[in-house]
């Protein structure tokens, strides 16, 4: 029986995405940074866990700083992104550091928007979140 040779499939050409959005989801346990294009398609992401931290260290500001820098680096190297709008969700301790890390990583920050979910008096909060 003759061998069938599989030809190499051509590699996808690098899409050049100059502008996008950086979503920072800052919870008390972790900070997740997702870089998307303007249509909302995910381009790169990173979190406190992917950096290498486990447990409560994932929620620290330093882990958020490293995660934001890592996500921006991935987006710049793979797609040449140089302008982002930052959208922040949540009240975790890493939100400020993540924004600072994005600004310091050499990418232009056009705007910063807080899109944290606020209930219109929905479910009763847990004991530690009640005043």
UniProtKB/Swiss-Prot annotation:
<dbReference type="InterPro" id="IPR019981">
    <property type="entry name" value="Ribosomal_uS11_bac-type"/>
</dbReference>
<dbReference type="GO" id="GO:0005840">
    <property type="term" value="C:ribosome"/>
</dbReference>
<keyword id="KW-0689">Ribosomal protein</keyword>
<comment type="function">
    <text>Located on the platform of the 30S subunit, it bridges several disparate RNA helices of the 16S rRNA. Forms part of the Shine-Dalgarno cleft in the 70S ribosome.</text>
</comment>
<comment type="similarity">
    <text>Belongs to the universal ribosomal protein uS11 family.</text>
</comment>
<dbReference type="InterPro" id="IPR018102">
    <property type="entry name" value="Ribosomal_uS11_CS"/>
</dbReference>
<keyword id="KW-0687">Ribonucleoprotein</keyword>
<comment type="subunit">
    <text>Part of the 30S ribosomal subunit. Interacts with proteins S7 and S18. Binds to IF-3.</text>
</comment>
<dbReference type="GO" id="GO:0006412">
    <property type="term" value="P:translation"/>
</dbReference>
<dbReference type="InterPro" id="IPR036967">
    <property type="entry name" value="Ribosomal_uS11_sf"/>
</dbReference>
<dbReference type="GO" id="GO:0019843">
    <property type="term" value="F:rRNA binding"/>
</dbReference>
<dbReference type="Pfam" id="PF00411">
    <property type="entry name" value="Ribosomal_S11"/>
</dbReference>
<dbReference type="GO" id="GO:0003735">
    <property type="term" value="F:structural constituent of ribosome"/>
</dbReference>
<protein>
    <recommendedName>
        <fullName>Small ribosomal subunit protein uS11</fullName>
    </recommendedName>
</protein>
<keyword id="KW-0699">rRNA-binding</keyword>
<dbReference type="GO" id="GO:1990904">
    <property type="term" value="C:ribonucleoprotein complex"/>
</dbReference>
<dbReference type="InterPro" id="IPR001971">
    <property type="entry name" value="Ribosomal_uS11"/>
</dbReference>
<keyword id="KW-0694">RNA-binding</keyword>
């Amino acid at each position: 029986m003759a061998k069938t040779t599989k030809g190499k499939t051509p590699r996808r050409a690098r899409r050049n995405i100059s502008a996008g959005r950086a979503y920072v989801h800052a919870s008390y346990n972790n900070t997740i940074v997702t870089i998307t294009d303007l249509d909302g398609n995910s381009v790169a992401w990173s979190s406190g866990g992917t950096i290498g931290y486990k447990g409560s260290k994932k929620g620290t500001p330093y882990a958020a700083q490293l995660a934001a820098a890592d996500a921006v680096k991935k987006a710049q190297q793979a797609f040449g992104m140089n302008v982002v709008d930052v959208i922040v969700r949540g009240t975790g301790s890493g939100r400020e550091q993540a924004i600072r890390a994005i600004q310091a990583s050499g990418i232009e920050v056009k705007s910063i928007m807080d899109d944290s979910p606020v209930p219109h008096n929905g479910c009763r909060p847990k004991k530690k979140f009640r005043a």
